[in-house]
């Protein structure tokens, strides 16, 4: 998610505190402890190895900002115009995933990896990120090299004004604070 998108709905043009989707923590993520996050739909995200889930249509493989749907869809029936709690269709059962390892078929309390450390860089168990031997590039997300040696160019965004092409230290807009 880029710095100029709402944390709740993934759309640009407003911040989470001004989100038109309303109440509470909306459809964003809430902290789960142990370094992972759980979406309001019950999906847990503990590493980049888990699939992307779109919060607009509920499908995997893309995020809401890349979704073809113009309006949010009901997570139960997939149609627009209402949300799952107001859906008239029978509730569709979904397989829950373990909050620890992200795999279906068991709960976190029954997970074989419950007491193991998980690396947030490679997603493997048994070590933490600072001890990981698989270096990961923060520019392209691939393993095997670091950002300074990355051949892929990336668009830089200014944290002050949100525009691309320059950094905050190069920004011509006055800081307001």
Curated annotation (Swiss-Prot):
One cellular component (GO) term of this entry: endoplasmic reticulum
The protein's assembly and partners: Associates with the 40S ribosomal subunit, the 80S ribosome and with polysomes.
Modified residues (N6-acetyllysine): 8
Keywords noted in UniProt: Acetylation, Cytoplasm, DNA-binding, Endoplasmic reticulum, Metal-binding, Methylation, Nucleus, Phosphoprotein, Repeat, Repressor, Transcription, Transcription regulation, Zinc, Zinc-finger
Consequence of changing residue 27 to K: Significantly reduces methylation
Renumbered zinc finger spans (CCHC-type): 4-21, 52-69, 72-89, 96-113, 117-134, 135-152, 156-173
Post-translational modification N-acetylserine, affected residues: 2
Residue ranges of the region described as RNA-binding Arg/Gly-rich region (RGG-box): 25-38
Protein name: CCHC-type zinc finger nucleic acid binding protein
Description of what induces expression: Transcriptionally up-regulated by sterol treatment.
Disease tied to this protein: Dystrophia myotonica 2: A multisystem disease characterized by the association of proximal muscle weakness with myotonia, cardiac manifestations and cataract. Additional features can include hyperhidrosis, testicular atrophy, insulin resistance and diabetes and central nervous system anomalies in rare cases.
Gene Ontology molecular function: any one: RNA binding
Modified residues (Phosphoserine): 49
Post-translational note: Arginine methylation by PRMT1 in the Arg/Gly-rich region impedes RNA binding.
UniProt superkingdom: Eukaryota
BP GO terms, sorted: cholesterol homeostasis; G-quadruplex DNA formation; negative regulation of transcription by RNA polymerase II; positive regulation of cell population proliferation; positive regulation of cytoplasmic translation; positive regulation of DNA-templated transcription; positive regulation of transcription by RNA polymerase II; regulation of DNA-templated transcription
Omega-N-methylarginine: residues bearing it: 25, 27, 79
Entry-linked InterPro entries: Znf_CCHC, Znf_CCHC_sf
Function: Single-stranded DNA-binding protein that preferentially binds to the sterol regulatory element (SRE) sequence 5'-GTGCGGTG-3', and thereby mediates transcriptional repression. Has a role as transactivator of the Myc promoter. Binds single-stranded RNA in a sequence-specific manner.
Known tissue expression: Expressed in the liver, kidney, spleen, testis, lung, muscle and adrenal glands.
Main location: nucleus
Compartments in which it is found: Nucleus; Cytoplasm; Endoplasmic reticulum
């Amino acid at each position: 998610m880029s710095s100029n998108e709402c944390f709740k709905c993934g759309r640009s043009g407003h911040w989470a505190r001004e989100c038109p989707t309303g109440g509470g923590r909306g459809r964003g993520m809430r902290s789960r402890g142990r370094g992972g996050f759980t979406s309001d739909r019950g999906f847990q995200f503990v590493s980049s190895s888990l699939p992307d889930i779109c919060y607009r249509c509920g499908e995997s493989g893309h995020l809401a900002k890349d979704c073809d749907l113009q309006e949010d869809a009901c997570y139960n029936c997939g149609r627009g115009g209402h949300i799952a709690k107001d859906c008239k269709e029978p509730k569709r059962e979904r397989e829950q995933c373990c909050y620890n390892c992200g795999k279906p078929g068991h709960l976190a309390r029954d997970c074989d990896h419950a007491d193991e450390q998980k690396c947030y860089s490679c997603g493997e168990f048994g070590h933490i990120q600072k001890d990981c031997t698989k270096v990961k590039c923060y520019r392209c997300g691939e393993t095997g090299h670091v950002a300074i040696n990355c051949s892929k160019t990336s668009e830089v965004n200014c944290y002050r004004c949100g525009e691309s092409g320059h950094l905050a230290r190069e920004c011509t807009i006055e800081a307001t604070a």
